[in-house]
UniProtKB/Swiss-Prot annotation:
Its cofactor is Mg(2+). It is an enzyme of class 2 (transferase). The gene is coaD. The record marks H19 as: Transition state stabilizer. Belongs to the bacterial CoaD family. This is Phosphopantetheine adenylyltransferase. It catalyses: (R)-4'-phosphopantetheine + ATP + H(+) = 3'-dephospho-CoA + diphosphate. It is found in: Cytoplasm. It comes from Streptococcus pneumoniae (strain CGSP14).
Amino acid sequence: MSDKIGLFTGSFDPMTNGHLDIIERASRLFDKLYVGIFFNPHKQGFLPIENRKRGLEKAVKHLGNVKVVSSHDELVVDVAKRLGATCLVRGLRNASDLQYEASFDYYNHQLSPDIETIYLHSRPEHLYISSSGVRELLKFGQDIACYVPESILEEIRNEKKD
């Protein structure tokens, strides 16, 4: 029997504790879980992808079956096929997230019907945490330590120094 391989993707700009919670929970569902950092052309980048990847790798190092990858110019389903993933993992905070994700699910299914999508609902303590909200707090000099993993906080501090 082959390994169950999943792929959880996002821009993770920056990664939040909500993302980490979804990754930890999804890691228990698969033999191997890839976390794919994708460049989103519709979002203005805050942290360079290298910083996001380094911080994310540190945040998930306690999860032996999780590997972080990044992609710039590929569709999610193409990355899933390349990695052998048969399931895409998506996190949902609210109905708006579901509506947004459902349109991608439609196209992904059209392009690759063998790849399933599962949705994990955010835990109540993470429902209102978003990367854009964290960026907004940072813009006004607010403390974000309770919203992001320590490794991400380090990457943000290091980036501010440069």
